[in-house]
Structure formats: structure tokens, C-alpha cells
């Protein structure tokens, strides 16, 4: 909110006061005074008054503020109003009375008695007179506004009725019921003349006082049809509308370009175009038992002043003539120059100014403890610890009430009279004694925008710049052009004003199912997305210049939002579960949100706060927010949600609104999710999208296809707009102030020829000196009558007029209008309709034909009206899709055509793509491209034509390498230089000799003959494959790690066991003696035999006698033979050897131990050459030490007598 106020600061400084005027929002009738050159007129909003049964009601033209003004008015079918007096006058035919009441429904009183058979009544607001006709007496009578001084103006008339008067022109009109004629006379009763006669009945008469034309309803008794007719005040320029209505019109009233009329039997008020007569809006007044009677549009333009100034009332003249009467007010005699002071002021001694009365100084205020004077008033105050009671006078000590008895909206104080509710400062207690109202209360003092405290108990309402305070001094309305709704209706896009008028189709071609759209106020374009064709398009607001931004790149887009300041747009794709963004030209596309998102639907953007807001309808429904880049995500709401659908932002108050389609509710909160509040529930059907503007929230409903609006603070005052709708989806309000911060002058100079000046979001065109603004408000004309092109000085006055300025006949206008399909909107004050309480099917509409109403299925559906089913045009073969060039896709209520490859279209028609002319063929430079239906052919020199064939270069590519040899690379060679750039996106061009053609080897992510298409499917599969590959890799690594850990554990166990066994040191079982080694065993228990050292194991190998000059050699049978020799020995035995071999003792140990003789000079670790471990055969393990083994062998006498043995090489192992 702070950021928005900062943007509005220059505007606030420029308009440093709060406007208290009441400009309305409607198109200025031709000839009426307008505002500062814009499209609005300064004045209050018009509204209707009508009689209904024995009551009189009022209702806004938009269907809101439907109130009963008079409860017991009798049969009041004849009525009129006096705007300056703010009174309604009506004839009570039952009691034969003329009565009146104020426009707000107060002070009902009798004026005078009337005779029977009164057939018409009108008010002369300039002469202050009442005029009525008597059909039976044939007279027209006049009286003053108090019912005095009655006199007969005209007599001897033929059944006069339907009196109308234009006091400005001093003319009076009436019709003759029997004769079927129209008459005119002066308001004084002279100059009576017949204007025209007809054989048909004239049902009702009304005047267009601005265009100076007389309108009437001409009824054909035989055909039962009516038409709207008009003529000028002299009876000339008669115009008959071609459109016939089956309604029997009872009363009518004109305002602007519209006629409001009621019928004899239907409980509705119709709005029609006064030129064409076509019905535009049907205002359904159900529940009601009788049709409405008299009807009038109340607005000052309906009763202008004689001097031609429609706004110069006596009250305004008084304000202009007050002179030095400061602080004065206009009294009962506004034309006098006497100053009259308002309450709280007193006239000064010189009688020229009003001075404030200080009530607190005179002690006549009635305050018990404190008093504070203000200009024109005062208020009571209380010290700390006391509260002001609801009477505004007494103070009471603050004693809180028990919590169980307090039902106050703010707080409660316990007094001697019991508990009493009180309110905070700047608020007062309402009539119910419980609710507070004021600037500090939730109702904001009843103000729609700004609440400005004047004292602790008084305040006044104000409006933001660009908005105007209305006559109720509470509500604000946007200035500028009238706002309208733009919404998607499944098969088309429509727009309508808030009052149901100008209900038309913007894009009516078959565009599939369109659910998402938004409006760009800068370029005045509409952006929309297709769910069937999977496109995103944009177009002008008149339906022209359609541009396709994305094709086949979205799946189920259901939400779209425009950043009109940042010039980007964002959309949700429920099918792909992500949110994407792009610039407004479809470039720089990026994914904004793709993680932790399920089924996004609605989306809204706040350009000032630079935040995105969206709804998620998935398994975890919630409302979320993030930055425009997708970071800083925040959950706005997650509880009590089922199907959160549409979402929107009130940029003035920084409030967030959303709807839940499943729960049928509308909710609101602050932008951070705080102060969440439920506005409407159970009576909003199946809401899809929401929009907010001014004081109302709009939302679309699928249950009863329509758009509904409620008050944005209370959820009350519900009004439904419908009319041949199928599934109204996304909707936006189009107005310059709906999206603040817009500068339309930035785009094409706002459409202005010379100077464009931005004013509250609208482009104001100005002209340079010496030029005059043209009637279109944008072009400039030279003062000498010639139109000059700005900046060029070119004379364009060649006798050609712009089309918009050419005169157009009424007949031509009717023909143009007749050729267009006019939609009729219906304003439903309640949900009751003429087709019964059950209503029609959601795919049907209630059609009124004369006095009967029936349900009819909409186009594209079949049934009896109560049950309608979709017609599958594709299956029935009734589609418009050409089977040779397109595929028919059925949609609800229609179908679309998806063009085949080689064709392009708009969803209906498919046209052949001329690849040759567009340069998208693949023929190459050496061929001639010929376009064919849906394809093309390439004609190569000397070869037949084939579709899509690439002709090679006439000079065959050389395969000769630098070394003079022919090189072959997988039978493919590179393309010649003439094909440089043939393959796109990094593809490699190759010549395939086998087929004598060229081909592209595309990089990953691209497909096509020239790698021209991005393979999104491959991209998704690649990411899916990478994900699977990553999962497999992780599993494999985990398995390998587990196996390694298992092996490490086994090795550790083995190592531990080995060390444990080696650490044991058992005694040697053999005695160390000089006995013969053959069969001698040492005595048991004899010590002194040491075991083999643990780290050393030796094996004695045979070598040749080096002394004989022979080289050492391997054993005869190899190393394995030596092992085999030991295998047959018993543990502890000594093997006999030859003189060349030493005796070898085998002792069975875990690793084995071979003991050489002690005379071996190579004994010890230094002389070891080879080693091996002997196997174990289950005998007792004996570890023999090196030292002991030497002593053991030296004890053998045979060994000592032998000649020295050749040296043995020994190897140490560990």
C-alpha cells in the first residue's frame, strides 16, 4: 500500500483537495455538457424509479441498490419526478389522489384529489406545474406543485393519454388511444396541432429533451408485436425501428441512447437501443407477483433548464451569488442575496459573514466532563480511565463487562444501567447498540475508500485521485470512460458494461476452450490462452490483429496475468504443473515456479510490490506468493481450502480476493494473508475467477452460467448478470484506473496526432498552436480548415473524409446493426426466473416469447432445455474441418480444427504453407522448389522430383586426403561449402553417398530435417532418463560400498585369527640330542627346543655344485616338484638325500618349516633365495626356530662327516 501511495504522490500533490463532486459514469448524450474534454459527464449516477404493485421502488441501472421507497402507494401506474425538489409525484388511481414523497422515501404526503379516469401525468419543472389528462372527459388539466389553482388547458379531445412535456421548448405532447394519433400544443394550451396518425395503437410516449425527438411505442394488435418509433417535434423525420418485439409495452422512459420500458404481464424491465429497438438488457425483478407499472429515469439531464445550462440550478446560482457571505448556505429563497448561516454558525453584525458559535464557552453543550469546540460544531471528551457513552455526552469510568455478556464489536463498559457497548475514538455506536462505525472500525465509517476524521465522533468520506464521491457521500466512482467486463466464455470472448449494455462478442471464431485471459491497458490488447489448440494469443480489443505468441508449448493454461508496468505476462499450466513467464512479445520465456506445485490455476501480479500470487488446487490446496523471479515463496493461506480457483488484487487497498470453487465461497485478506475474511458463501455457485473494482467484487459462476457481483466489504447486495453464457471463466475489469500506474502515452503516443497527456490512466490528446482538435479527439485540424500531418506539413484536404465522420443514414445503421448478432444480458436481482424455480440446464437459456418462457439449449448442445448434452461434431461429421488438411477436435459446445503438417490456420480454416516462397524448404541451392498441397518437391538436375529431396552439389565431394589416399568416415563425408549453414542449431551436415543425399546430425534437443525444431519431448525424456540413470548410479554405489565393507570385515576377521594363532608359542616335541635322526623322538617335556621364528620361513632348494662350474638351476620338476617331495613325508621325518642334496626335515606347521644344515654358510636371512609354504595335513603344528634348527641339524654325525655342500640360496618371506 505504501508503494502505491508513493506512486500516487504527484497526483495527490496536484489535487491537494478531495473532490466532493459527484461525476457519474455514462456516455454523454449528444449535445449535453461534458467534463474537461473527456468522455464523461459531470453529474450524479442515473437510477430508475418504478411502481410495482402498490409500492414504489428505486434501483440503479446496474441492478444494485434495489430499495422500496413507498410501501402503500396504491395503484400508481402514472408517476413523474421533480429533480430540483427531489420529489416523486404519482397518481393513486384507486383512491383518486395525487401524492408525493422525497426521492429517499421520506415524508409521504397528499397533494390533492383527482377525478376518475386519469390517463396521463407529467411535470413542468420550469413553470412548477403538474399536468394530467382525463381520457373519459377528453381534457388536459394543470395545477401548481401544491395542488392549488387547478385549471383546464384543453378540452374536447379524443381520448387523450400519455402526456409528455418539454418546458424548455414550451411544448406539450399527448396521444389518442382510440384514434392512434399524436398531438402537440403549447404549454399554455394554444397552437394545438396533429403530428401524425397511424392505424396501430400507440402504447407509450416519451421525450428525448436533448435530441428534441418524440418517441412512442407502436403496437400491432393483429400480430401482437411492437416497434419503437420516433419523430422530431414537428412530426417530421419519422424513424421506425426494424426490430420488432413481442412485448406489450406499458410504460417507457428515455435516457441517453437507451429506452427503458415495462410490459403488461412480465415482471421485468427491458432496456433497448432507441435507434434500433433491439433488446439489450433484461432486468429481472423476481420475486414479484405483478409486473412493474410506471417507470422513469432520474437524472438532471432529463430535466434541463430553459437557459440551456443543464447544470445551472437555483442552488448553484445561490452559491455563485453569495459574494462575501463566508460560511453561508442557500436557503429557501436561493435567488435572494440574504446570507443564511448553517447550524453551528451565527450571522455577523454586518450581515456579510457567518461566525462559528463556541458551544463549549456558553456551557450549553451538555458534556459531563470535557468539551472541545470545532468550526460549526463541538464534541464531548473524557479523561483517561473514562469512556464516552453512546449518547455522546456522558463519561463513565471504564469497568469492563464479564466476557460472557459482551456482544459488542469493540468493547463493553459496566454501568448502573447494565453493560453498555462503546466504540473507540473516531467511531460511534450504531442503532443496534453493538456495532461500531467510523474510521477506526472495520466498516471504515461506511466509506468506500477514504475515511477522514473530523472529531472523535464525526468524519467524512473521501476518494482517491481519479475517483469521485457520489451523492450518498460514501461511495466513490471512477472518472473517465465507463468500465466494462471482459471475460472468456469457453468458445468466445465477450464484454459488457456493468449495467448489461453493450453486451457483445469480441472474438467469436471457434477458438477451442479459452479459460485464461487478461488485458494490457497500455497497448489495449487482450491476451488469452487455448486449452484445446494449446496456443497463447493476443489481439486488439476490436478482435483484429490476432498474433500467436506460443504454439504447442502449453498444456492446460487456466490462469494468465499481465504485468502492465514491467511489460511481461505470466501464466499457470495445470497440465505441466508449473508457472511460466515471458515478455509481451513471446520472447525470453522462462519457468518461474516448478517445484512443490501441483495444480496451479488462478494467478495475479502486483507490479508495484513485484510479487506473484497464485492458487494451487492440488493435494495440498493453498494460496501462495513469490517474487516475479519465483524466489521468496510464501504461503498466504492453506487452511480451510479445497479448490482455490480464481485470485485478484485490489490495488487501492492492497487486498487479496480469491474464490473456492468446491466450497462455493469468496474470501479476502491482506497481501500477507492476515485478516482473512469470508465474504460470500453457498450462493455463489461454482466460482471460477474473480475481479475487483470500485466497491464490488465480480466473479464468474459455472453452476448458473453468469457473472455475479457483491459488495467487496460485506458480500451483500448481490446482483447476477447472465445471457446465453456457457462457462464464463477468467474475467477482468477494463478501465484506466483498474490497473493504476498505466501510461497509455508510451504506446504510439496514445493514438494522438500531436501531444499526448496522461491523466488518471487515460490519454488526453492536445494540439499545437494553430490547430484545432478534430471530432475524433485525436487528430488535429489547422485553423484554416486544412488538416496537417504533424511534423510533415502535408496537406491532406483532398476532399476525402474519415469514415467515422461520414454521414450515415438511419437505414444504413439499421442494416449494419441487423447483420450483427446482439446478445441480450439479464440483470437478476434474485435467482428466480420466468422458466420456473428449477430453472434451465447450465447449457440452456430461458427464452421469453411473448408472454411465455421456455428453456432452449445453447448452440452446440441438444436436448429439451432441461437437459442438454454436447453435440460431437467430429463424430457426426458435421464439422467444418477439411479432412485432408486438419484434425477435428471436439470441445464443449463446439469444435476446433488442428491443422496437419504443411498447413496453418486459425482453428477453423487451414491453408497450405508455401514452403518455397517462405524459404523453409530443404531443397538446397542446386534444386528448384515447387510448392504442392501440404508439401513441396525439389527438382534436381537430371533426377526425378521427390518431396523434400535435397539435391547434391553437381561436383561430387572429394574423399581424397592430404596424403593422397581416399579416406572413408563411416561412409559419410562432410557437405560442400555450398551447404554451409544448412543445418541449424549446431547440427553437422553429412553427405550420404549411398542415397546420394545430404542429412543433418542434430545435437541433443533438436529434431527436423535441418534441426530446426526443439525437441521438447526429447528434453523431457532426457531429463527423465538422467533421473533414472542417477538413481541406478546411486544404488550401484551403495551396493559396491556394502560389498567392500563386507570384504573388509572378512579380511579383518581372518587377520585377527591369524595373529591369534601366530601369537601362540607351543613347546618343541623333539629333544635336542646327538641321537640318530632316524626314528629318534625327543623325550616328552624336554625343553630347550625353540620354534621357528614367526617372521621367517625358509625352503632349501637344490642347486648345482658351483665348484664344478655349473650354474644354479631350478629343480628338475620345478618348484612344484619340491613341494611334492615333502608331501609324502611324515611330520618330523628326515628325508635321505644324495651327496648333492642336503637332508631336509619336514615339520608340519601352519606354514611349514624346512631346516637347512648348520654348516650352511648362507644360513640366516641374508642367504635366503627362494621360499614357499608347505601345506598342512592335519598333524600337530610345530614351529621351529631358525637358531634351534641349526643346532638340531649339527647334532647329526652323518652330516658332520660329509664333504661341504655347495652353497644354497635362500629367500626370506614374511
Swiss-Prot record:
EGF stimulates the growth of various epidermal and epithelial tissues in vivo and in vitro and of some fibroblasts in cell culture. Magnesiotropic hormone that stimulates magnesium reabsorption in the renal distal convoluted tubule via engagement of EGFR and activation of the magnesium channel TRPM6. This is Pro-epidermal growth factor. Disulfide bonds join 360-371, 367-380, 382-395, 401-412, 408-421, 423-436, 439-451, 447-461, 463-476, 745-756, 752-765, 767-780, 835-846, 840-855, 857-868, 874-888, 881-897, 899-910, 916-929, 923-938, 940-951, 975-989, 983-1000, 1002-1011. Residues 314-355, 356-396, 397-437, 435-477, 741-781, 832-869, 870-911, 912-952, 971-1012 form the EGF-like domain. PANTHER family: PRO-EPIDERMAL GROWTH FACTOR, VITELLOGENIN RECEPTOR-LIKE PROTEIN-RELATED-RELATED. InterPro entries: 6-blade_b-propeller_TolB-like, cEGF, Cueball_EGF_LRP_Nidogen, EGF-like_Ca-bd_dom, EGF-like_dom, EGF-type_Asp/Asn_hydroxyl_site, EGF_Ca-bd_CS, Growth_fac_rcpt_cys_sf. Glycans are attached at residues 38, 104, 117, 148, 404, 815, 926. LDL-receptor class B repeats lie at residues 86-127, 128-169, 170-211, 212-258, 483-523, 524-566, 567-609, 610-653, 654-696. The chain crosses the membrane at residues 1032-1051. One of its GO terms (molecular function) is calcium ion binding. Residues 23-1031 are extracellular. It holds the Pfam family cEGF. It is a single-pass type I membrane protein. It comes from the Eukaryota. Residues 1052-1214 are cytoplasmic. Keywords: Disulfide bond, EGF-like domain, Glycoprotein, Growth factor, Membrane, Repeat, Signal, Transmembrane, Transmembrane helix. It comes from Sus scrofa (Pig). Residues 1-22 form the signal peptide.
Amino acid at each position: 500500500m505504501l508503494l502505491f501511495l508513493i506512486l500516487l504522490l504527484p497526483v495527490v500533490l496536484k489535487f491537494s483537495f478531495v473532490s466532493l463532486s459527484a461525476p457519474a459514469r455514462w456516455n454523454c448524450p449528444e449535445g449535453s455538457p461534458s467534463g474537461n474534454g473527456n468522455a464523461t459527464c459531470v453529474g450524479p449516477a442515473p437510477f430508475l424509479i418504478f411502481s410495482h404493485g402498490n409500492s414504489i421502488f428505486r434501483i440503479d441501472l446496474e441492478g444494485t441498490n434495489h430499495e422500496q421507497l413507498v410501501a402503500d402507494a396504491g395503484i400508481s401506474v402514472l408517476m413523474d419526478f421533480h429533480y430540483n425538489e427531489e420529489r416523486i409525484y404519482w397518481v393513486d388511481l384507486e383512491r383518486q389522489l395525487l401524492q408525493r414523497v422525497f426521492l429517499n422515501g421520506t415524508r409521504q404526503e397528499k397533494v390533492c384529489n383527482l377525478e376518475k379516469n386519469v390517463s396521463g401525468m407529467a411535470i413542468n419543472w420550469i413553470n412548477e406545474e403538474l399536468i394530467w389528462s382525463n381520457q373519459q372527459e377528453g381534457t388536459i388539466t394543470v395545477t401548481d406543485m401544491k395542488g392549488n389553482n387547478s385549471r383546464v388547458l384543453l378540452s374536447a379531445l379524443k381520448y387523450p393519454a400519455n402526456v409528455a412535456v418539454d418546458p424548455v421548448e414550451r411544448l406539450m405532447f399527448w396521444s389518442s388511444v382510440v384514434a392512434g394519433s399524436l398531438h402537440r400544443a403549447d404549454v399554455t394550451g394554444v397552437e394545438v396541432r396533429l403530428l401524425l396518425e397511424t392505424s396501430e395503437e400507440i402504447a407509450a410516449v416519451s421525450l428525448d429533451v436533448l435530441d428534441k425527438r418524440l418517441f412512442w411505442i407502436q403496437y400491432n394488435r393483429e400480430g401482437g408485436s411492437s416497434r419503437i418509433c420516433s419523430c422530431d417535434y414537428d412530426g417530421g423525420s419519422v424513424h421506425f425501428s426494424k426490430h420488432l418485439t413481442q412485448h406489450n409495452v406499458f410504460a417507457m422512459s428515455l435516457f441517453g441512447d437507451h429506452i427503458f420500458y415495462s410490459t403488461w404481464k412480465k415482471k421485468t424491465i427491458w432496456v433497448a437501443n432507441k435507434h434500433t429497438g433491439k433488446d439489450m438488457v433484461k432486468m429481472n425483478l423476481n420475486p414479484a407477483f405483478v409486473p412493474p407499472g410506471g417507470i422513469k429515469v432520474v437524472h438532471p439531464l432529463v430535466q434541463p433548464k430553459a437557459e440551456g445550462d443543464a447544470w445551472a440550478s437555483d442552488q448553484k446560482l445561490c452559491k455563485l451569488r453569495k459574494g462575501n457571505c463566508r460560511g453561508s448556505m442557500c436557503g429557501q429563497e436561493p435567488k435572494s442575496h440574504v446570507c443564511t448561516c448553517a447550524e453551528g454558525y451565527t450571522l455577523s453584525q454586518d450581515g456579510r459573514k457567518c461566525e462559528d458559535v463556541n458551544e463549549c464557552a456558553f456551557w450549553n453543550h451538555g458534556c459531563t466532563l470535557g468539551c472541545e469546540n470545532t468550526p460549526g460544531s463541538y464534541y464531548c471528551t473524557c479523561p483517561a480511565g473514562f469512556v464516552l457513552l453512546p449518547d455522546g455526552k456522558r463519561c463513565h469510568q471504564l469497568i469492563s463487562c464479564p466476557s460472557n455478556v459482551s456482544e459488542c464489536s469493540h468493547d463493553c463498559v459496566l454501568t448502573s444501567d447494565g453493560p453498555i457497548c462503546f466504540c473507540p475514538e473516531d467511531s460511534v455506536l450504531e442503532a443496534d447498540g453493538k456495532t461500531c462505525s467510523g474510521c477506526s472500525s472495520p466498516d471504515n465509517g461506511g466509506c468506500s475508500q477514504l475515511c477522514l476524521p473530523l472529531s472523535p465522533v464525526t468524519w467524512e468520506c473521501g476518494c482517491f485521485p481519479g475517483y469521485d464521491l457520489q451523492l450518498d457521500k460514501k461511495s466513490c466512482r471512477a472518472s473517465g470512460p465507463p468500465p466494462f467486463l471482459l471475460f472468456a466464455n469457453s468458445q468466445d470472448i465477450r464484454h459488457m458494461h456493468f449495467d448489461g449494455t453493450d453486451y457483445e462478442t469480441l472474438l467469436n471464431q471457434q477458438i477451442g476452450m479459452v479459460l485464461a485471459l487478461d488485458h494490457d491497458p497500455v497497448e489495449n490488447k487482450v491476451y488469452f490462452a487455448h486449452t484445446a489448440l494449446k496456443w497463447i494469443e493476443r489481439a486488439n480489443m476490436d478482435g483484429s490483429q490476432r498474433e500467436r505468441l506460443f504454439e504447442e508449448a502449453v498444456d492446460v493454461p487456466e490462469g494468465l496475468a499481465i504485468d502492465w508496468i514491467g511489460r511481461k505476462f505470466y501464466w499457470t499450466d495445470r497440465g505441466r504443473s508449473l508457472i511460466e513467464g515471458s515478455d509481451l512479445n513471446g520472447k525470453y520465456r522462462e519457468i518461474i515456479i516448478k517445484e512443490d506445485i501441483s495444480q496451479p490455476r488462478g494467478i495475479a501480479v502486483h507490479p508495484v510490490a513485484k510479487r506473484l500470487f497464485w492458487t494451487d488446487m492440488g493435494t495440498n490446496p493453498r494460496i501462495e506468493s513469490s517474487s516475479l523471479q519465483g524466489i521468496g515463496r510464501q504461503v498466504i493461506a492453506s487452511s480451510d481450502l479445497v479448490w482455490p480457483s480464481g485470485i485478484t488484487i485490489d490495488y487501492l487497498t492492497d487486498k487479496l480476493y480469491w474464490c473456492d470453487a468446491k466450497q462455493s465461497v469468496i474470501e479476502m485478506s491482506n497481501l500477507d494473508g492476515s485478516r482473512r475474511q469470508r465474504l460470500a458463501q453457498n450462493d455463489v455457485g461454482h466460482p471460477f475467477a474473480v475481479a475487483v473494482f470500485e466497491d464490488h467484487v465480480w466473479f464468474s459462476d459455472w453452476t448458473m452460467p453468469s457473472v455475479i457481483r457483491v459488495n467487496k466489504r460485506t458480500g451483500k447486495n448481490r446482483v447476477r448478470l447472465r445471457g446465453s453464457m456457457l462457462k464464463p471463466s477468467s474475467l477482468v475489469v477494463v478501465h484506466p484506473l483498474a490497473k493504476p500506474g498505466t501510461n497509455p502515452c508510451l504506446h504510439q503516443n496514445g493514438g494522438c496526432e500531436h501531444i499526448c497527456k496522461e491523466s488518471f490512466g487515460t490519454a488526453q490528446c492536445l494540439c499545437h498552436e494553430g490547430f484545432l482538435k478534430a471530432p475524433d479527439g485525436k487528430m488535429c485540424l489547422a485553423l484554416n480548415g486544412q488538416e496537417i500531418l504533424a511534423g510533415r506539413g502535408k496537406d491532406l484536404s483532398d476532399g476525402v473524409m474519415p469514415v467515422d465522420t461520414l454521414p450515415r443514414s438511419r437505414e444504413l445503421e439499421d442494416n449494419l446493426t441487423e447483420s450483427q448478432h446482439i446478445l441480450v444480458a439479464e440483470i437478476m436481482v434474485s435467482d428466480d426466473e420466468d422458466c420456473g424455480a428449477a430453472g434451465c440446464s447450465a447449457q440452456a437459456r430461458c427464452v421469453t416469447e411473448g408472454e411465455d418462457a421456455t428453456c432452449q439449449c445453447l448452440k452446440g448442445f441438444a436436448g429439451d432445455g432441461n437437459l442438454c448434452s454436447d453435440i460431437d461434431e467430429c463424430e457426426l461429421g458435421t464439422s467444418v474441418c477439411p479432412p485432408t488438411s486438419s484434425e477435428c477436435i471436439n470441445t464443449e459446445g463446439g469444435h476446433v480444427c488442428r491443422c496437419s503438417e504443411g498447413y496453418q490456420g486459425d482453428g477453423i480454416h487451414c491453408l497450405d504453407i508455401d514452403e518455397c516462397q517462405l524459404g523453409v524448404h530443404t531443397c538446397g541451392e542446386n534444386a528448384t522448389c515447387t510448392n504442392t498441397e501440404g508439401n513441396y518437391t525439389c527438382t534436381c538436375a537430371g533426377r526425378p522430383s521427390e518431396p523434400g529431396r535435397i539435391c547434391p552439389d553437381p561436383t561430387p565431394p572429394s574423399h581424397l586426403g592430404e596424403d593422397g589416399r581416399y579416406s572413408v568416415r563411416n561412409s559419410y563425408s562432410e557437405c560442400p561449402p555450398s551447404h554451409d549453414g544448412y543445418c541449424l542449431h549446431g547440427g553437422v551436415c553429412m553427405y550420404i553417398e549411398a542415397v546420394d543425399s545430404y542429412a543433418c546430425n542434430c545435437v541433443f534437443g533438436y529434431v527436423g530435417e535441418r534441426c530446426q525444431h526443439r525437441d521438447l519431448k526429447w528434453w523431457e525424456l532426457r531429463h527423465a532418463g538422467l533421473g533414472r540413470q542417477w538413481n541406478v548410479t546411486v544404488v550401484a554405489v551403495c551396493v559396491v560400498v556394502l560389498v567392500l565393507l563386507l570384504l573388509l570385515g572378512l579380511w579383518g576377521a581372518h587377520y585377527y585369527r591369524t595373529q591369534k594363532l601366530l601369537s601362540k608359542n607351543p613347546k618343541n616335541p623333539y629333544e635336542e640330542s646327538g641321537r640318530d635322526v632316524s626314528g629318534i623322538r625327543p623325550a616328552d617335556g624336554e625343553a630347550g627346543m625353540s620354534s621357528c621364528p614367526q617372521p621367517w620361513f625358509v625352503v632349501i632348494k637344490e642347486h648345482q655344485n658351483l665348484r664344478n662350474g655349473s650354474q644354479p638351476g631350478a629343480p628338475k620338476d620345478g618348484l612344484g616338484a619340491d613341494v611334492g617331495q615333502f608331501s609324502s613325508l611324515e611330520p618330523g621325518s628326515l628325508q635321505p638325500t644324495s651327496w648333492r642334496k642336503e637332508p631336509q626335515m619336514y615339520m608340519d606347521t601352519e606354514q611349514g618349516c624346512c631346516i637347512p644344515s648348520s654348516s650352511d654358510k648362507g644360513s640366516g636371512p641374508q642367504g635366503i633365495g627362494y621360499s614357499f609354504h608347505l601345506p598342512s595335513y592335519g598333524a600337530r603344528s610345530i614351529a621351529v626356530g631358525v637358531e634351534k634348527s641349526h643346532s638340531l641339524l649339527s647334532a647329526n654325525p652323518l652330516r658332520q662327516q660329509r664333504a661341504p655342500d655347495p652353497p644354497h640360496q635362500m629367500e626370506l618371506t614374511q
